[in-house]
């Protein structure tokens, strides 16, 4: 637990320093954009450390979604992440995978990251986004934080194909490239 406390203290200190610098300079719009990217980077670096510490399987990916996916983390916003699993993976209760996932999410909270997390396969992401526009929008603004880049690329390919197809069916007069 000592390592988590050290990570928490470093995260809090670095975040406080960024916010203090912004307040001291009376940041302009451009300055605020830089701050949002720096806060996003700070959270992303901590997530990468926690991901490695959790020793999650190599076939998984940690994906930033929503504002965090845009690389714009507002000072008091939660950090929205998707723990992306390959299709056919089900973290059953009591399984080693589920234990590792719960440990990773718990470590995030223990270090001061207020995360909003979902654990889904690519197929589950597609199904959820087809039925919920908030999920669809959140996934639209996604980027890989760490983990399996090929899985993330496959998710993006399928998600974009579904989203463009759905949008075109809904708005048939809209031109698409």
Regions found by a protein language model. Name each.
Residues 23-31, 87-96:
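Intrinsically disordered, low-complexity coil segments
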């Amino acid at each position: 637990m000592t390592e988590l406390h050290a990570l928490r203290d470093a995260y809090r200190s670095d975040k406080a320093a960024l916010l203090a610098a912004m307040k001291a300079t009376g940041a302009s719009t451009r300055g605020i954009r830089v701050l949002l990217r720096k806060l996003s980077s700070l959270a992303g670096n901590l997530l990468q450390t926690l991901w490695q510490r959790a020793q999650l399987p190599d076939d998984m990916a940690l994906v930033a979604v929503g504002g965090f996916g845009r690389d714009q983390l507002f000072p008091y916003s939660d950090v929205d992440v998707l723990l992306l699993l390959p299709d056919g993976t089900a973290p059953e209760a009591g399984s080693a995978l589920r234990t590792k996932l719960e440990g990773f999410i718990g470590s995030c909270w223990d270090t001061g990251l207020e995360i909003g997390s979902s654990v889904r396969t690519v197929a589950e992401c597609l199904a959820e986004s087809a039925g919920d526009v908030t999920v669809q929008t959140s996934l639209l603004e996604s980027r890989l934080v760490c983990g399996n880049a090929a899985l993330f690329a496959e998710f993006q390919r399928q998600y974009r194909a579904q989203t463009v197809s759905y949008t075109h069916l809904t708005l048939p007069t809209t031109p698409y490239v």
